[in-house]
């Protein structure tokens, strides 16, 4: 990373900033190492056993698969053979005096770095020393890496930000051989002079490195223009065109260091006000156009060359952003935007610094650039993630090696990314860059029914601003859109729900009308009994149509019981179901046949024998069911026809009475026509006269 203050440019992310394309981008197949981090030889975390043991699992959890080694300006002062650098040299030292006067030993040598990288499952991307090194020193490194198991390097870069005056070793009394027109304490050479010098000397490096390993992948620094806040120069096209035209045949990639801002502390170098959090987050909207510029130049000189983002961050200076939720949103948008545009990998600068030595949370978080804190005493405290780590962690759900990543069309302030992962599952990231308002966005149409939702929101945070809330939903539930809190990231990933099971039985498969049907069932979730209080629905169905829905909750052990009285005779199906966002649906059916019951119909006369002309009371008793039921009472005098003497609805007791004058032997009959529960019936009584 740069150590000098550059001329300030307009703040990206403000009004008029470039935005992403209005349509979905073409899916890009991600490399084997899309997610990277910069680690320098002086790194105090990765070189300390206790710190390493704390950080490595977190790097694995976030899917880091590249380490960019040798570290910013240190790269051009670092001797990999002695594991020393010259960063503490006072001004005015001669080149010959370096090793004797001011050598500094580093803790993280190449062997240990390689061991840690292989444990992480990461590739190594190394920058060789172009400042105080030589082609032979670089070639020896390449040879050892190729010949030593576990020390392989996937990509080699010649020099760090060699287009910038801050890399000219201006404190020297005499220059290294590869720096042209050097004047001690004098002005920086022009971009053209620097580019021509680099093209010649970098060619010498390439020749030596290729001789050591013909398969070595070698890259060079890419210079942004001054419209980019950090690691940028005027006349950048002179640098890029000169190098690519001269050495393009041997260049496998360019290394672009992207810092959209150049502020640190309370103001940027020009004294301007710091950008707002929203401006910081929305600065990533420039990335598609910046990548297009790089690719356009490469297509002219070296179409096969790849683009590596060897360093990135909000600014090349320490800021408060890594303490804030904006740091997570920026980091996620940064890495996903570059990868979706076509970058081979994106490396955050740096893993850690010496800034947050006593960190306990946001209350004492110091301005920083890093992903992790560096505890003053590893024996009593462990490195803690800062918010850029959270951004990479969330982005890793999409940025899998071999995935097909695309940036979907932007919806207002919402950035949208979709990744088809190896195996076919789909993941989506939605970033609401608006820090003041919630926004609604759609997630595309490729998601499976069951989804895991990870939400990182500035408005719902813990004391370290690293809280990610995890819930579950379905594609159907968010088909019309998902509401994103202000300043938030929502990541949707497909999931395979846990299994569930259900049984359902009844006391009998056949019951008489008017009788309760008692059903018992059991619900299991992921092979174990469901806890008490889980809701189960039981539908009473006829011919596939639901007549009624009963809701019941499980008891301890997963059992449940429900009772019902079917409204009529016939065949019924009771369908029990359980639906959730966590488990697969569970269903169970049970068939019940309801048959008609015989009514308890009786008929009685007030007397069995009377004198002719005597009035008798004839009473019919229906019994259950008797509410609103109609009976018909007949009288048939001996030798005469059967006649209706009363047709009426029974009273509340289920009875119907009639007074009849008996003149001769008479037979009384009562009939019930039947209904949906009961069969037709009749009863008779005789009176002699």
Q: Where are the language model's segments positioned?
A:
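C-terminal beta-strand-rich structural cap/linker in extracellular carbohydrate-active enzymes
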Residues: 471-498, 666
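Proline-enriched interdomain boundary motifs that mark the N-terminal boundary
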Residues: 499-507, 598-605
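N-terminal catalytic cores of secreted or lumenal carbohydrate-active enzymes
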Residues: 18-249
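Aromatic/acidic polysaccharide-binding cleft in carbohydrate-active enzymes
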Residues: 309, 313-399, 403-416
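Short strand-edge motifs at loop-to-beta-strand transitions and within beta-strands
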Residues: 480, 558-562, 654-658
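Enriched for extracellular/lumenal, surface-exposed ectodomains of secreted and cell-surface proteins
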Residues: 566-588, 662-682
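Noncatalytic carbohydrate-binding groove/subsite architecture in carbohydrate-active enzymes
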Residues: 193-334, 341
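Carbohydrate-binding surface patches
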Residues: 410-448, 453-456, 490
């Amino acid at each position: 990373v740069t150590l000098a203050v550059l001329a300030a440019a307009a703040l990206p992310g403000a009004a008029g900033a470039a935005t992403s394309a209005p349509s979905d981008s073409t899916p890009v197949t991600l490399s084997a190492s899309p997610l990277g981090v910069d680690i320098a030889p002086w790194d105090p975390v990765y070189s300390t056993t206790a710190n390493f043991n704390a950080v490595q699992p977190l790097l694995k959890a976030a899917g880091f698969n590249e380490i960019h080694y040798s570290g910013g300006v240190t790269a051009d002062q670092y001797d990999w053979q002695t594991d020393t650098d010259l960063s503490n040299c006072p001004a005015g030292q001669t080149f010959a005096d370096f090793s004797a006067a001011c050598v500094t030993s580093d803790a993280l040598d190449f062997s240990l770095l390689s061991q840690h990288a292989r444990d992480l499952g990461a590739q190594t991307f190394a920058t060789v020393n172009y400042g105080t090194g030589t082609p032979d020193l670089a070639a020896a490194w390449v040879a050892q890496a190729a010949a030593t198991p576990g020390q392989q390097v996937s990509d080699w870069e010649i020099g760090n930000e060699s287009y910038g005056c801050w890399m000219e070793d201006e404190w020297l009394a005499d220059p290294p051989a590869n720096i042209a027109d050097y004047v001690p304490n004098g002005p920086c050479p022009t971009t053209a002079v620097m580019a021509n010098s680099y093209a010649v000397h970098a060619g010498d490096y390439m020749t030596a490195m290729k001789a050591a390993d013909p398969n070595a992948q070698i890259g060079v620094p890419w210079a942004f223009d001054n419209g980019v806040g950090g690691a940028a120069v005027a006349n950048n096209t002179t640098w890029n065109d000169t190098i690519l035209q001269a050495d393009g045949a041997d260049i496998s990639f360019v290394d672009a260091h992207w810092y959209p801002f150049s502020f640190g502390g309370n103001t940027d170098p020009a004294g301007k006000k710091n950008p707002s959090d929203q401006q910081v987050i929305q600065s990533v909207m420039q990335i598609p156009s910046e990548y297009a510029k790089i690719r356009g130049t490469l297509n002219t000189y070296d179409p096969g060359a790849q683009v590596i983002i060897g360093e990135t961050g909000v600014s090349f200076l320490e800021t408060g952003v890594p303490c804030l939720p904006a740091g997570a949103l920026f980091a996620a948008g940064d890495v996903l935007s570059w990868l979706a545009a076509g970058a081979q990998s994106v490396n955050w600068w740096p893993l850690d610094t010496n800034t947050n030595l006593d960190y306990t949370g946001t209350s004492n978080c110091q301005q920083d650039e890093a992903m992790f804190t560096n505890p003053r005493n590893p024996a009593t405290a462990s490195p803690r993630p800062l918010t850029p780590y959270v951004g990479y962690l969330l982005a890793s759900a999409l940025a899998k090696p071999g995935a097909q990543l695309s940036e979907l069309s932007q919806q207002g302030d919402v950035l949208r990314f979709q990744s088809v992962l190896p195996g076919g599952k789909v993941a989506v990231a939605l970033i609401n860059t608006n820090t003041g308002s919630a926004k609604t966005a759609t997630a595309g149409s490729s998601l499976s029914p069951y989804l895991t939702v990870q939400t990182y929101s500035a408005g719902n945070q813990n004391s370290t601003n690293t809280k990610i809330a995890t819930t579950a939903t379905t594609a159907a539930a968010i088909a019309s859109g998902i509401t994103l809190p202000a300043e938030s990231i929502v990541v949707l990933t497909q999931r395979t729900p846990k299994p569930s099971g259900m049984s359902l039985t009844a006391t009998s498969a056949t019951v008489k009308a008017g009788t309760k049907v008692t059903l018992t069932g059991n619900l299991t979730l992921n092979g174990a009994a469901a806890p008490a209080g889980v809701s189960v629905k039981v539908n009473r169905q006829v011919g596939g149509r639901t007549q009624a829905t009963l809701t019941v909750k499980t008891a301890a052990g997963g059992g449940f019981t429900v009772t019902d009285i079917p409204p009529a005779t016939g065949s019924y199906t009771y369908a029990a179901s359980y639906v959730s966002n966590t488990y697969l649906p569970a269903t169970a059916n049970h068939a019940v046949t309801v048959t008609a019951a015989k009514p308890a119909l009786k008929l009685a006369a007030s007397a069995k024998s009377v004198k002719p002309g005597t009035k008798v009371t004839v009473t019919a008793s229906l019994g259950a069911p008797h509410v609103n039921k109609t009976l018909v009472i007949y009288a048939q005098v001996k030798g005469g026809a059967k006649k209706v003497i009363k047709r009426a609805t029974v009273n509340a007791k289920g009875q119907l009475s009639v007074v009849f004058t008996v003149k001769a032997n008479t037979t009384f009959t009562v009939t019930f026509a039947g209904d949906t529960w009961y069969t037709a019936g009749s009863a008779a009584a005789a009176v002699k006269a």
